[in-house]
Swiss-Prot record:
UniProt cross-references to NCBIfam families, sorted A to Z: RecJ_Meth (NF040701)
Domain of life: Archaea
MF terms in GO: nucleic acid binding; single-stranded DNA 5'-3' DNA exonuclease activity
Gene that specifies this protein: recJ
Listed name of the protein: Single-stranded-DNA-specific exonuclease RecJ
Organism taxonomic ancestry: Archaea, Methanobacteriati, Methanobacteriota, Methanomada group, Methanococci
Source species of the chain: Methanocaldococcus jannaschii (strain ATCC 43067 / DSM 2661 / JAL-1 / JCM 10045 / NBRC 100440) (Methanococcus jannaschii)
InterPro entries to which the protein is assigned, alphabetical: DDH_dom (IPR001667), DHH_sf (IPR038763), DHHA1_dom (IPR003156), RecJ_exonuclease (IPR053584), SSDNA_exonuclease_RecJ (IPR051673)
Length: 469
């Protein structure tokens, strides 16, 4: 990234602070954890005097937990761009506004529109006319590390995992800056790229289970194991092949998966509007990414499954387990991660049953929503996405889930990938507009985002209707 001035400047400032006290603050999702892994490796290699801190988000409350005065340099990764004004005001309040290059922000989220003060080095792809959808926070952290030492391509694998965890392969493959980072990870022998069916659980689930939960197009196969098995048997008969529905996707020959994909494409044509049909192939086939160094059949081999394992820890505050597994532990912490994963899946199952049996899905013209105080706010977004498997949920509309949080309400929004492709729905823009109208804050991605609102649920819904017209 020869022309990325702020990236070069940030790398130089870090090297100038090698003997000073440094604090590195990262977000808590897969992108945040992989950013932390990259920056922790960087700190070890440069022998920095660095402390680390995880932060769920920067708010008026949590910014007071950041010890700005105790450190010469503070680095934020996968957060900070959306809170530039708040960070600037806190530095002013603490009489630190004369400290040049006090803060480095490594982020990819939409920045606040303010004049960047001399105290902050803001490294974000959007400032160089790149998209925040083609590189994640870990990707920016990786390029930052590479600006210090161009040979550190062994760190690229973390950035690829961060990108997959942030669903930046939504178009069926990683693009733009992510593609260049992926090439580094491939060159270093860490990541393998394949074309495969876009179904979750390639390494760990039987084929029929992966098909059971595939909801990018709602067909008669969803949640119907007997129908899925009969469907596979009919494919076997039609093509004179033998696909075992209990085999994992990773075990099935590509030629057989290509046949399944083609048959699924034909089936899906009966379930979508005509103008959606050109986009169906993108949700059936695409690139998948594996870590070569992980065992075949391990939930850590497929990067989507690895990301779920991280979420099963970090969403419940167990950052230590996720980080240690990322850094290479396959003993004590890996066993703890698998235990966390079982609990996480059980929580999701119970929450989905609650939505199915006890919650009213309220339909609006352009979206739908539900309210509950029975689902943990840390998983409500995942549950919102999973709710498309429920018959009462209209799979052709976005869904918003509203649950109580410490200081008001958390709102999580999801929509099917096809809706983003065919109708150009942008939930992030809508939720940001509606939340700010009621003195809250929100943002994220076109297809998955969230917000915090103090109260005014009814007003928030009203502004959502305006935003999604």
């Amino acid at each position: 990234m020869e022309n990325w001035v702020e990236l070069k400047k940030g790398a130089k400032v870090l090297q100038n602070n090698k003997n000073n006290k440094i604090l590195i603050v990262t977000h808590i999702d897969t992108d945040g954890l992989t950013s932390r892994a990259i920056l922790q490796k960087l700190a070890e290699r440069l022998n920095l005097d660095a402390d680390f801190m995880f932060l769920k988000q920067i708010t008026i409350e949590t910014i007071n937990d950041i010890p700005f005065k105790d450190y010469d340099l503070i680095i934020f990764a996968d957060l900070g761009s959306g809170q530039l004004k708040m960070i600037k005001e806190k530095l002013d309040e603490l009489n630190l506004s004369d400290k040049r290059d006090k803060i480095i922000i490594l982020d990819h989220h939409q920045p606040e529109e303010i004049k960047i003060p001399k105290t902050i080095i803001h490294i974000n792809p959007l400032t160089i006319a790149k998209s925040g959808a083609e590189i994640c926070g870990a990707g920016v952290s990786y390029l930052f590390a590479k600006a210090i030492n161009n040979d550190w391509i062994d760190l690229a694998k973390y950035a690829v995992l961060g990108a997959v965890g942030d669903i930046q392969n939504i178009e069926g493959k990683l693009i733009g800056l992510n593609r260049k980072i992926l090439c580094d990870a491939i060159m270093n022998g860490d990541v393998k790229v394949k074309t495969d069916l876009q179904m979750y659980g390639r390494q760990t689930r039987p084929l029929f289970v992966s098909m059971r939960y595939w909801a990018d197009v709602r067909t008669d196969l969803l949640n119907n194991d007997s129908k899925i098995i009969k469907y596979i048997q009919s494919i076997n008969k039609k093509y004179d092949i033998e696909i075992n529905p209990t085999m994992r996707l990773a075990e099935i020959p590509f030629e057989h998966k290509r046949i399944i994909g083609n048959e699924l494409l034909i089936k899906c044509l009966n379930y979508v509007p005509n103008h959606w049909t050109p986009y169906i192939p993108k949700v059936i086939f695409g690139e998948v990414y594996e870590f070569r160094g992980e065992e075949f059949g391990s939930p850590l081999r497929d990067l989507e499954e690895f990301s779920t394992c991280i979420n099963a820890c970090s969403r419940y505050g167990d950052y230590e387990t996720a980080l240690n597994v990322l850094m290479g532990d396959r003993d004590k912490y890996y066993r703890k991660m698998l235990s966390n994963l079982r609990k996480h899946r059980n929580n999701l199952r119970e929450a989905l049953e609650h939505v199915k049996n006890d919650v009213e899905i309220i339909q609006k013209d352009r979206f739908q929503y539900f309210e509950t105080d029975k689902i943990m706010s840390n998983i409500v977004g995942i549950v919102a996405g999973m709710s498309y498997s429920i018959e009462e949920v209209d799979w052709m509309k976005p869904i918003f889930a509203i649950t109580e949080d410490e200081n008001g309400y958390k709102v999580s929004a999801r929509c099917p990938k096809l809706l983003c492709f065919a109708e150009d729905v942008n939930l992030a823009k809508a939720i940001k507009y509606a939340s700010e109208k009621v003195n809250g804050s929100g943002g994220g991605h076109k297809f998955a985002c969230g917000a915090y609102i103090p109260d005014n649920k009814r007003e928030f819904i009203k502004y959502l209707e305006i935003a999604l017209r």
